[in-house]
Amino acid sequence: MAQKFTILFTILLVVIAAQDVMAQDATLTKLFQQYDPVCHKPCSTQDDCSGGTFCQACWRFAGTCGPYVGRAMAIGV
């Protein structure tokens, strides 16, 4: 039973890491931003970016909508 949990946990970590790497890929980011009108739109709260498919995070320091990546995904920007 413990081995099954270990295998499932390892698979989960690999999937999370792969998703994080893919989200940081510049080509993929540019492709999504090209088709998401919310990207780089000025915002002050998360609700301002809620209509986006890829750029759903309000980056406070930039004041624009952007994607959740890396640490920002964990802390909710």
Swiss-Prot record:
UniProt keyword terms in alphabetical order: Disulfide bond, Knottin, Metalloenzyme inhibitor, Pyrrolidone carboxylic acid, Signal
GO molecular function, one term: endopeptidase inhibitor activity
Residue ranges the record marks as coiled coil: none
Distribution of this protein across tissues and organs: Ovaries.
Positions of disulphide bridges: C39-C55, C43-C58, C49-C65
Domain notes: The presence of a 'disulfide through disulfide knot' structurally defines this protein as a knottin.
Biological role: May play a defensive role against insect attacks.
Family label: To potato MCPI.
Protein name listed in UniProt: Metallocarboxypeptidase inhibitor
Protein species of origin: Solanum lycopersicum
